[in-house]
From Swiss-Prot:
GO terms for cellular component: chloroplast inner membrane. One of its GO terms (biological process) is potassium ion transport. Signal peptide: none annotated. It holds the Pfam family CemA. This is Potassium/proton antiporter CemA. Belongs to the CemA family. The lineage of its organism: Eukaryota, Viridiplantae, Streptophyta, Embryophyta, Tracheophyta. GO terms for molecular function: antiporter activity; proton transmembrane transporter activity. Contributes to K(+)/H(+) antiport activity by supporting proton efflux to control proton extrusion and homeostasis in chloroplasts in a light-dependent manner to modulate photosynthesis. Prevents excessive induction of non-photochemical quenching (NPQ) under continuous-light conditions. Indirectly promotes efficient inorganic carbon uptake into chloroplasts. It comes from Lotus japonicus. Keywords: Antiport, Chloroplast, Hydrogen ion transport, Ion transport, Membrane, Plastid, Plastid inner membrane, Potassium, Potassium transport, Transmembrane, Transmembrane helix, Transport. HAMAP family: CemA_PxcA. Its main location: plastid. It is a multi-pass membrane protein.
């Protein structure tokens, strides 16, 4: 009976995390053929953002330089020039193919993530029973921890998220989110987010300690500040 009771929170957590992912993954596989066919049939020329447009234009400019080089090599034999033209043509076809694959990848991943968040939001509204079970289990688990362990955990998490060495971790995390949504990485935006997120989290943490922990467990606050110093 106790084992069955202990497995209920685990099943609730598993359903909350993996059920939306499984549904969105299934939708992605179902949409893949339709999106690919739609893109290739319509031959869409829509660029999803200015960064992608600059990237593809840069590649075309590189090919244009090769064509200009072709004109400068008129003294080469006709066979050599034909080989050069064939190579440039193949590179152009490959560039267009890569561009189409990138656009399809962007559309699929963006749509999949939107579906995932919609399902997760709906699940959080409709799946009240699972959330109540999970919340009670988390509160019971935290209640059984000593103040020292709680303070150590808070200190560890804060150092990982807003500590001196957290910058590289934030860059990897935001970069992976960019990639997951199918967008091209923008170093300027990532640098701005990396310099902003830790400050916001640090402010929220201090406010939480001041308003909540001081009221619930003053001894935990004392231990936390002692360890932090």
């Amino acid at each position: 009976m106790a084992k069955k009771k202990a497995s209920i929170p685990f099943l609730s957590l598993t359903s909350i995390v993996f059920l939306p992912w499984c549904i969105s993954f299934t939708c992605k596989k179902g949409m893949e053929y339709w999106v690919t066919n739609w893109w290739n049939t319509k031959q869409s020329e829509i660029f999803l953002n200015i960064i992608q447009e600059k990237s593809i234009l840069k590649k075309f400019m590189e090919l244009e330089e090769l064509f200009f080089l072709d004109e400068l090599l008129k003294e080469y034999s006709e066979t050599r020039l034909q080989i050069l033209r064939t190579g440039i043509h193949k590179e152009t076809i490959q560039l267009i193919k890569t561009h189409n694959e990138d656009r399809i990848y962007t559309i699929l991943h963006f749509s999949t993530n939107i579906i995932y968040f919609i399902i997760l939001s709906g699940y959080s509204i409709l799946g009240n029973q699972e959330l109540i079970i999970l919340n009670s289990w988390v509160q019971e688990f935290l209640y059984n921890l000593s103040d020292t362990i709680k303070a150590f955990s808070i200190l560890l998490v804060t150092d990982l998220c807003i500590g001196f060495h957290s910058t590289h971790g934030w860059e990897l995390l935001i970069g992976s989110v960019y990639k997951d949504f199918g967008f091209i990485q923008n170093d300027q935006i990532i640098s701005g987010l990396v310099s902003t997120f830790p400050v916001i989290l640090d402010t929220i943490l201090k406010y939480w300690i001041f308003r909540y922990l001081n009221r619930v467990s003053p001894s935990l606050v004392v231990i936390y500040h002692s360890m932090n110093d």
